[in-house]
Amino acid sequence: AGSSDAIKIGMSGPLTGGAAVYGTAVQAGMEIAVEEVNAKGGLQFELKCQDDEHDTEKAANAYNALKGKGMQIMAGPVTTAPCNVVAAECANDKIFMLTPSGSGASIIEYGDNIFQICFTDPNQGVASADYMATHDLGSTIGVIYDSSDVYSSGIYEKFAAEAQAKGLNISCVEAFPADNKSDLTTQVTKCKD
């Protein structure tokens, strides 16, 4: 709907780049939802999307572009690092923000107008350790995680703490940087030894 009475929703997320699978899925879902709601008549919505490429600076630019187009509701960003930047702006500008998939625990701390739909990183780490302990999935655990990624590191930290509390033995922890995601042979070999 292009009506001036339509509620303007801004969405930002990675629509290109390595994390695009997340952003494009959210964009497609939002486009379908807006189309279905608008087809029923009554309250109308207008959706504008911006690519943040999972980059904090580009997320800030996307937010400002959407705000400049009259955005009233922020749907996104989609990933945690951009969410932290945009949440601070939304809190300051008093714009309602709802992230469908930003999972960092700090996101909602920016203001009472910032909301998350999905589970947080700490919850994922704790739940994983609890599941492994409850289902007796192994007495010795190796952990391999992306040390350059807030999401991966956040899950690892909470997993390690909960695993220790549950008496699980983490015998190997190997991290890899962002530039080495395609070959984890070294990390797997170290954990196997």
Region spans (language model):
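Short, high-confidence coil segments that cap the C-terminus of an alpha-helix
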Residues: G70-M71, L137-G138, D193
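Beta-alpha junction/loop-to-helix N-cap segments that form part of ligand/metal-binding clefts
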Residues: V21-A28, E36-E109, I117, P177-S182
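An alpha-beta-alpha
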Residues: L15, I114-D179
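Immediate post-signal peptide segment of exported/extracytoplasmic ligand-binding proteins
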Residues: A1-G13, A39-Q44, A133-T140
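Conserved hydrophobic residues forming the short capping helix/wall of the S-adenosyl-L-methionine
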Residues: V34-N38, A160-A163
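Non-catalytic positions within long, well-ordered alpha-helices that form the structural scaffold/packing
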Residues: A60, K67, A133-T134, K192
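Short beta-strand segments enriched in small/hydrophobic residues
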Residues: D5-Q27, P77-V78, T140-D146
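Short hydrophobic/charged patches on amphipathic alpha-helices used for structural packing
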Residues: A60-Y63, A129, T185-T189
